[in-house]
Amino acid sequence: TVFGSQVAIRGFREQGNGTLYNMLGGSFDGKFLTPGMGVYSSTKASINILTKYLIEENKNTGITIASISPGVLITENWLNEQKKLSRDEWEKQRPVANIICDHVETVAPWIVSEIIKNDKSGVRIAWMSLRKILLRFFKAKVLMQKRDLFSRYGI
């Protein structure tokens, strides 16, 4: 991300404009610490800080710099981490994972539409708002509307 950002910004400066989005993830703001995800989350936190610096350093240049926070996506890497858990550990995590996770193909079209609409630096495009999280927990726990995101992966 660091080197890619450097190369992109150099090119944007030469052409007089451009748009850069950095992908956040994990606990990029340090609010939620997930066991076993320390290194990954630390790198995402550093990307958040890098993005803030890039925004500041490229004001009034014609370069738009923003970030994307896609939420917890079910990726191959994420699935591999879950498969390392014991059956009991996974069964404890599965109900919450069904509430907070999403498939990439669910989130990606929305993110793209938000990128197309945005022309401001400093914007964080975030799929999972606090309202959305609370609504999902309400639907799952009160309305008993359960999601099953993982059976298609055999876990």
Question: Where are the regions a protein language model picked out?
Answer:
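Structural signature of the Rossmann-like NAD(P)-dependent dehydrogenase/reductase core
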Residues: 3-5, 18-25, 64-69
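C-terminal helical subdomain
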Residues: 67, 85-138, 142-143
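Short beta-loop-alpha junction of Rossmann-like oxidoreductase domains
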Residues: 31, 72-83
